[in-house]
Structure formats: C-alpha cells, structure tokens
Amino acid sequence: VAGGLGSHEQVSYWLNHGADAVQVGTAFAVTIEGDAHENFKRVLIDADPGALAEFTSVAGLPARAVRTPWLVRYLRQEKTLQAGACADPRRCSQRMDCLTQCGIRDGISRFGQFCIDLKLAAALRGEVSKGLFFRGASRLPFGKAMRSVRELIDYLLDGTMPAAA
C-alpha cells in the first residue's frame, strides 16, 4: 500500500488487513539521517495542504509537489509549453534518457515539459527557487519536528511517540 500513510493507525490497519508492506515517502525524506539538504527537508516539513499543487509529471504520471517559485512559474506556462511539444532527442539537456517516456524529449504534449533530473537535483541541493519538491498530502507524523529514522519506525510500527525534544 502506498501513499497517504503517516500514522501508526494507518500502517497497522493495512498490515492487519493483508498488506505485505506499506510505502511511506515524505516522512522518511525529512528524517535527520536523510542526505538531502536542510532546505529540502524544511520545504517538505513546512508545506501545508494549500501549498501543494497537482499536475502531470514529465513521465506522464500524476504528481503532487510544493508550490516553489519554479513550480509556480512552470504551472503558469504549462499549457503553452505543452502546445509546443515536439519529439527531439536533443531536447534532453542531460543526454541520459533517464525515463522510458519523457514529455520533453519525446514531445508528448499531455506530459510535463521540464527536465526532471535537473529539478530533482536542485531540490536535493536545497535550491528552493529552482527545485521540484514532491510531497505527499498527508500530515507528517511529527508535525514540524525533524526526527530520526528509528523514532519514525518505532512510531509507525509500535505507536511509540518520541519524547518531546
């Protein structure tokens, strides 16, 4: 089961109802041990539901991300960019064919029209104005606090909340 899981009760429900595993993304991305830049973690932690936007990714999949300056500009131009889509392998600025299908390289107009590699790398480096910060819509288990992986696992599996910091 993937998506929308952020509490012990939700994880327990699915595991007790036959799921072999659950996928928890954002809560692990913002742990102390996570190797992303501090700004990356803060953007995800500080985003409230109104700060999120849903759109189609460059791979053609539904996406949800924090409305950063880059994403706001992109969404304003998205229809124009999609209307000008044309298949041209040279449009892949990284020349790495990181996706099987890519809206910008393959000219698929209904897909996103940006380089996902560049945008995710900027986010990982903490470049808030340039990065794409994917985020789940669920409330984070520890609110605005950044906790360890051990504390997160203890909470998700056992319901043990860490002591106040």
Where are these regions (language model features)?
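Conserved active-site-proximal phosphate/metal-binding subdomains
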Residues: G6-A165
